[in-house]
Amino acid sequence: MLQHKFVKKELIDKGWSGDKKYCVTDEHGNKFLLRVSPFEQYERKKSEFEIMNRVAALGVPMCKPLEFGTFDEGVFSIQTWIDGVDAEENAQNLTSDEQYFYGFEAGRILKEIHRVPAPEGIEDWEIF
């Protein structure tokens, strides 16, 4: 059951997942990312949420997982909101040096993420 009370909900019509994604705002003006998935994906989404907690504990700059559960629309997770711009739309506005810097930084962050062991039953991602 949702522990947060939201006063505003805006659909985010981007991204690669089939999840419904929303920018939600609480009564204090704080923004969060709300992801909603079908009930059938409960176990998978629970595992993703647990992995996100382990990755966040490493200090990786990311949306921090706050809450997970079910409600009348399906399985949900609530994460902290990070303001920013869409890299796909804005990368061409950066200099070559800036693009290199952000690409290098993304690789460094990905290396940190790979410190988290692959879950049981999933092929070890060290081979990638």
Model segments located where?
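ATP-binding pocket architecture of kinase catalytic cores
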Residues: 10-127
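Juxta-kinase regulatory segment immediately upstream of eukaryotic protein kinase catalytic domains
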Residues: 1-8
